[in-house]
Design a protein with these regions (language model features):
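Short beta-strand-loop/turn "lid" adjacent to the catalytic site in phosphate-handling enzymes
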Residues: 64-101, 130-136, 169-192, 217, ...
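A conserved beta-strand/loop element that lines the FAD pocket in flavoprotein oxidoreductases
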Residues: 211
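N-terminal glycine/serine-rich phosphate-binding loop of ATP-dependent small-molecule kinases
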Residues: 1-96, 108, 125, 231-243, ...
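Active-site core segments that coordinate phosphate-bearing ligands/cofactors
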Residues: 5-8, 69, 107, 114-178, ...
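Residue-level signal for inorganic ion chemistry
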Residues: 24, 47, 75, 103, ...
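A generic structural motif
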Residues: 32-33, 101, 288
């Protein structure tokens, strides 16, 4: 057996490849950004071929870094979820750009679905989701309805649909495996999370030909092997692709949240809080959604999830659009230079509000600005906004789960911010635990792949590899934090419903 597991981590703004050894340590890593396309306000697209090429390139770089003696036992994939790709079965050519999870172009389709009596209840009951442009189903419908000839070609069986892990597995296996794992399938709004199968009624309602859909599979099994002849990946020929999970479920697994009641938050482009709710799907009454966390060894685990669309992207906005900071780290330095945000509240609803508000028509706002407001106050307001968003999610989760969450495990790029995590602990009134090895999303995919081929023998062995770096505990007075949170809710009310429905 090989000495390493290769994890392919395909994210919203970059593709990464990480090689893990048996101790869960990073042995080699490569990362590459790829272009974002914004054809209209509120629309977000990726070129699927750029996704593939960037992922292929970083895998080749990571293998080269490790050297010619690297022996790979298996490949795990984790990915940005909901992003929707439609391609030609024969040529592998995409028929259109990938419609990214952040894209709001299908808000009108969602509005019509909501107007149908009983539709919201049916979708919630079967899929665990709310009707929102976030999920893949309406994105796929848009492609079929708007790309010339796509619907006819789909009905003739000439096209294939997939989320990003499906696309990557299909490319790696030379088209031999057209599959999706249960965690990604559960984010499409087409998948019944109770039967673990595509739902014929929902596909019919959205006019989705079922011949397009990939075969649903568990999160830890051999899907196929890498074909020879992929440039830079010749050494992977014959290596099994054997683990896959959506990025947030993968992070939950990688954080060792394997027991009911354990929760994590990923501070990435968006913010994603997930709680393991065990082997029974819990229906949310507080604006959250229910998804498959993973299916392993014949046992399916579910998660409550709250997703916000813009978190780390707000820091990128300060840097790239406003030019207030030169690097992401500078946001932290500026925020630490002031004791608070000076009464400024920023709601980063650039592409609407996710859980628990689900307002497709919200847009970003900054309130409380005075002549004394500095860029340091704005920087701190951004970091505090991210913590407020997570607090919204955690409050909803506590309400739905009916049990107390005693610690929040955290990861993601923005989790390096001590300022933000201190404030997060203050707001939640519980410890916030950051691990030493922050690549928990990639490690989750590696662990699922490793378990499939016996690289690791048990989830207990995987869980023991997690080590804390720092645990943040509440410091500010609760009354002060409660008042700040009250004002945050006022600021959110200013952002809601800003765009008028067409």
């Amino acid at each position: 057996m090989g000495s390493f597991i290769l994890a392919l981590d395909q994210g919203t703004t970059s593709s990464r490849a990480i090689l893990f050894d048996r101790g869960g340590h990073v042995a080699a890593m490569a990362q590459q950004t790829f272009p974002q396309h914004y054809p209209q306000p509120g629309w977000v697209e990726h070129d699927p071929l750029e996704i593939w090429e960037s992922q292929r390139s970083v895998a080749a770089q990571a293998l080269e870094e490790l050297g010619p003696d690297a022996r790979i036992a298996g490949i795990g994939i984790t990915n940005q979820r909901e992003t929707t790709i439609l391609w030609d079965k024969a040529t592998g050519e995409p028929v259109y750009n990938a419609i990214v999870w952040q894209c709001r172009r299908t808000a009108g389709i969602c509005d019509k679905l909501k107007e149908t009596p009983g539709m919201a209840e049916t979708i919630a009951e079967k899929t665990g989701l709310v009707i929102d442009a976030y999920f893949s189903g309406t994105k796929l419908k848009w492609l079929l309805d708007n790309v010339p000839g796509a619907r006819e070609r789909a009905e003739r069986g000439e096209l294939l649909f997939g989320t990003v892990e499906t696309w990557l597995i299909w490319r790696l296996t030379g088209g031999a495996a057209h599959v999706t794992d249960y965690s990604n399938a559960s984010r499409t709004m087409l998948f019944n999370i109770h039967t673990l199968a595509w739902d014929e009624e929902l596909c019919r309602l959205l006019a989705i030909p079922m011949c397009l859909l990939p075969r649903p599979v568990s999160n830890s099994e051999i899907y196929g092997t890498v074909v020879p002849g992929i440039e830079g990946l010749e050494a992977l020929a014959g290596i099994p692709v054997c683990g896959a999970a959506g990025d947030q479920q993968s992070a939950l697994f990688g954080q060792g949240c394997h027991e009911r009641g354990q929760a994590k938050n990923t501070y990435g482009t968006g913010c994603f809080t997930l709680m393991n709710v065990g082997g029974r799907a819990v229906r949310s009454r507080a604006g959250l959604v229910t998804s498959v966390a993973w299916s392993l060894g014949g046992k399916t685990i579910y998660a409550l999830e709250g997703s916000v669309f813009n978190a780390g992207s707000a820091i990128q906005w300060l840097r790239d659009e406003l030019g207030l900071i030169g690097t992401s780290h500078e946001c932290d330095l500026l925020a630490e230079s002031v004791p608070d945000a000076g009464g400024v509240y920023l709601v980063p609803a650039f592409t609407g509000l996710g859980a628990p508000y689900w307002d497709m028509y919200a847009r970003g706002c900054i309130v409380g600005v005075t002549r004394g407001t500095t860029r340091a106050h704005i920087a701190r307001a951004v970091l505090e906004a991210i913590a407020f968003e997570v607090t919204d999610l955690m409050n909803a989760m506590r309400q739905d789960a009916g049990c107390e969450i005693t610690v929040l495990r955290v990861d993601g790029g923005a989790s390096v911010s001590d300022v933000m995590l201190r404030f997060q602990s203050d707001l939640l009134r519980i410890p916030v635990d950051r691990p030493q090895m922050v690549e928990t999303t990639a490690f989750g995919a590696a662990a699922l792949a490793g378990l499939a081929v016996g690289f690791w023998q048990s989830t207990d062995e995987v869980r023991a590899l997690r080590v804390s770096d720092r645990v943040f505990s509440p410091e500010r007075a609760q009354a002060e934090c409660d008042e700040k949170y009250r004002l945050w809710k006022r600021a959110v009310s200013c952002a809601c419903g800003w765009i008028e429905k067409a």
